[in-house]
Amino acid sequence: MIDKTAYCLKNGILYIDGKAVFGIGSHYYPSYHPKKVPVPENGDRYGEMKRDFADMKAAHVNIVRTAAVGTFSEKGDVINGSFPLGEAIAEELDKIGVALTVRLNGYDNGINEYPDEKMLDENDKPLKNCWSQFITNSVCHEGAKNDNARVTGACAEFFGRFKNVVGFQIFNEPAFPCEGFYDYNPSTIEEYKKARAEKGEQNAEPPRRRPFYNEDPEPWIRWRLFNSEKFNDYLNFLGEQAKSKKADAETFTCMTCCPVQIGSSMRGADFFRVAEKMDIVGMTLYLDCKGAFYYEHSRVMDYAESAAAVFGKHFWLIEYNAKTDMSARDFEVETYAAIGSGAKGIMYYQWRGDYVFGDSPEPNGFGMIYNDRTPTAKYSSALKMHDLLYRAGDKIVCKERVRQGIGILHSEHANAYYDAICNGENKNAWNGKEANVFSVMSVYRKFKREFVSLLAVRASELKKLPFKLGALIVPEENGLSDEEKSELALFEKRGGKVFYYDEYLDSFKPSCFCGRWVEAYEIADKYGVKIASVADKKVDLKFLADENEYAISVIDFAEDEREISYLKIELHAAVKGESCLFMSGEKVEYLTINRGEKVTVTIPVLKNGGILFIEKR
């Protein structure tokens, strides 16, 4: 039972007045950049805030993210913060019954500005400040780390006194830079040498380049894994500082897609490492959600949800695309996709476009409305989707993504291995050529076309998963650590089946290979939990469920907008009843369940997407 309090997050689910609700979120002054604001300093910030909040409340927004922008004073070991705008935001939102999360870190909130605190690249050049690179200090620099911890604690303590503050965000889009290799700060190298000495290797120097084709990749792998571990440990450490100030406020960060895409080993961030320690897996997502890119959009969400689920937790879209030039169709499609991947909250970025300064980073670039409050093209459709989430939120938010019985291995070791052997002299993360990442993308797409969403898992958690896997797909046979290989063998001893993707044959090789490769559909048919399918190749189905009911998110991801007439969905799971509820935008209708040779439901008209609610049998 959840205690009835005005606002709370409990295991990633938002409760308001004791009722579980889907998080319908937005942002207001969420940035530390002085030119990323809706109202300039000389404007009527407080008057316009009240007007904006009234509009947001009318649109069913129930949670907002802001940033702890303020000033700090130090007295001995105590840091005090002053946040007049943030304080006013918290108070005004509480008056209208809206929850608040606070981003506690901007651009390294250190107060001492140590001369040696910056990250260094492979040429010992300090990282240059950039508005979109939020962590610039070495995460191993004790002085900078301590300063950030103290400031994080001070911010959390200040905002923790507001009853509607339910969550704390640690940094924004944290990762090593896209360009160059990091971090070669002396403090990082010293920590690396200590770690290697504990393994029996004295005076180990980190490599400054990837190995040549005839060199051992292991030194590079060890160095990248060390940096990733330290980077994510740093985020988790700051999360603990925030948590110590308000234990019932849930912690999260807002990761980009980089943990599971090309360049992941260079950038260091990892969903699983953060999921293990923080309360929520939070992410940013601006990928296109139509056409061929739809699968990558879905894959990133499913990986984030999987990382959370492995530890019995949930994921949120802390920033979801709401560009001012976004079409109504794009907004609707991405929302149905997010619902189906199991998000417990969507915080569309943002409510109002940034004020247009002469040198604004993103003037009027993101928002439901433009800075002058002119509605964007998507505005009316966005409000309809908000209303859908408001009306159906309790039917959605307490359901979990269906665990369909087939996993895909996530391996940081393999990511580092393929970074070492595939990327040569490339120093730009987005130009990566890691073969295993391309294999992952191909494998995910194959199973998605069988209407099976793969569950991403690490080898280290295979023996203690809170859900059952009958089969595990390994994207590439090479590049695994000895520990991972041992865990795969134990998984098979416990009755699981391991398949290795063969890129050459575009099929799968069982671990006990006896001359026959198998196709994705064969694995899906034998080991997958099939819920439903549809013949249209540009329609996807995603599945949520509780003990009594399925929620099937139906997504039309075709490039161009269309209306599909009489879309027939075949049901493979056992269901009961003669009809089922279908909700799409403002439309609500009951559809007949046809029980002939096949059990089907026909949607008379589908435009962009919708949700079917069907009772389990």
Each model region followed by its residue ranges:
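Polysaccharide-binding and catalytic clefts of secreted carbohydrate-active enzymes
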Residues: 122-297
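N-terminal carbohydrate-binding accessory modules
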Residues: 1-58
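Conserved, mostly hydrophobic/aromatic
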Residues: 18, 56, 155, 168, ...
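The substrate-binding groove and active-site-proximal loops of carbohydrate-active enzymes
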Residues: 29-46, 67-83, 130-149, 216-233, ...
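Short, acidic/polar
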Residues: 38-56, 148-155, 262-274, 327-335, ...
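Carbohydrate-binding surfaces of carbohydrate-active enzymes
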Residues: 289-617
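Hydrophobic faces of well-ordered beta-strands that scaffold small-molecule active sites
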Residues: 22-26, 64-66, 100-104, 166-170, ...
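Aromatic-lined substrate-binding rim segments of carbohydrate-active enzymes
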Residues: 46-124, 230-245
